[in-house]
């Protein structure tokens, strides 16, 4: 069959267009995917088989729900990892101090929670440093853990993070608790994904406003800990889970 040259050109252009769309789609997915590793290594859990769960809470400190959550964790003798928004840590250093005094790990979640995929490098650096200063002002020395807001990153983001001496932390299970209709909804979302060695993302606050209602998250956390402790799981902090990687 004779194919005219202009048809060949059209086919080639179509192929390039499809490939371009696929590449952009893949890059977009990887920029937000919690377990994606294209833009740099980030810890998001252990291999299957480890009966450990690391509970992590973003967007605090928040009154009264962070304090209520601390009571639940203390009741079960569980320690967790909290990624704090710097402006809230500066607003309520007393709650940040309560987190630290109860033996939990505190990490950096930027100062105002911007989407880092659309921020210039200078603003990314400033957000991280301002958050670090706010947390240090509240509790003093704290961990070098960092979680990007919404998990968003792009090429170069993790380079800046590591230049500042921070370790990027993502997750592989979430309770979708930012707009959950009930505690049962959160519990079901988490339970469907738990496989052992998981980093669970929950929220004790909200980037949108201080004082957000996270009572459902507090209730779900209570139930999840009871459920998985009964099944023989250990609840650990992110640093404790990461040490397991160096041992295994």
Enumerate the language-model features and the residues they cover.
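N-terminal pre-catalytic segment of deacetylase/amide-hydrolase enzymes
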Residues: 1-55, 62-77, 91-94, 222-226, ...
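Active-site beta->alpha N-cap acidic-glycine motif
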Residues: 31-117, 123, 127-130, 134, ...
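Short, well-ordered coil/turn segments that N-cap beta-strands
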Residues: 50-53, 76-80, 102-104, 140-144, ...
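Charged helix-capping and loop-helix junction motifs
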Residues: 97, 121-128, 183-188, 214-221
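A short acidic, helix-capping loop that chelates divalent metal ions and anchors anionic groups
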Residues: 114-119, 207-211
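His/Asp/Glu-enriched short active-site or ligand-binding loop at hydrolase and phosphoryl-transfer sites
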Residues: 152, 158-194, 233-244
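Catalytic grooves of carbohydrate-active enzymes
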Residues: 191-239
């Amino acid at each position: 069959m004779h194919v005219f040259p202009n048809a060949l050109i059209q086919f080639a252009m179509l192929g390039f267009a499809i490939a371009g769309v696929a590449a952009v789609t893949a890059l977009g997915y990887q920029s937000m995917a919690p377990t994606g590793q294209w833009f740099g290594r980030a810890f998001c859990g252990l291999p299957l088989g480890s009966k450990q769960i690391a509970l992590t809470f973003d967007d605090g400190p928040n009154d009264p729900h962070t304090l209520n959550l601390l009571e639940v964790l203390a009741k079960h003798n569980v320690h967790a990892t909290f990624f704090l928004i710097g402006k809230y840590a500066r607003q309520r250093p007393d709650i940040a101090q309560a987190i630290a005094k109860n033996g939990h790990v505190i990490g950096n979640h930027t100062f105002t929670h911007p989407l880092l995929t659309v921020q210039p490098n200078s603003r990314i650096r400033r957000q991280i440093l301002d958050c670090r200063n706010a947390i240090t002002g509240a509790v003093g020395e704290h961990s070098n853990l960092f979680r990007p807001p919404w998990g968003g990153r792009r090429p170069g983001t993790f380079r800046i993070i590591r230049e500042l001496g921070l370790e990027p932390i993502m997750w592989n299970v979430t309770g979708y608790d930012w707009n959950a209709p009930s505690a049962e909804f959160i519990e079901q979302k988490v339970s469907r994904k738990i496989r052992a060695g998981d980093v669970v993302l929950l929220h004790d606050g909200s980037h949108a406003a201080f004082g957000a209602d996270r009572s459902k998250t507090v209730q779900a956390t209570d139930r999840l800990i009871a459920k998985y402790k009964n099944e023989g799981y250990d609840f650990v902090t992110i640093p404790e889970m990461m040490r397991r990687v160096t041992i295994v």
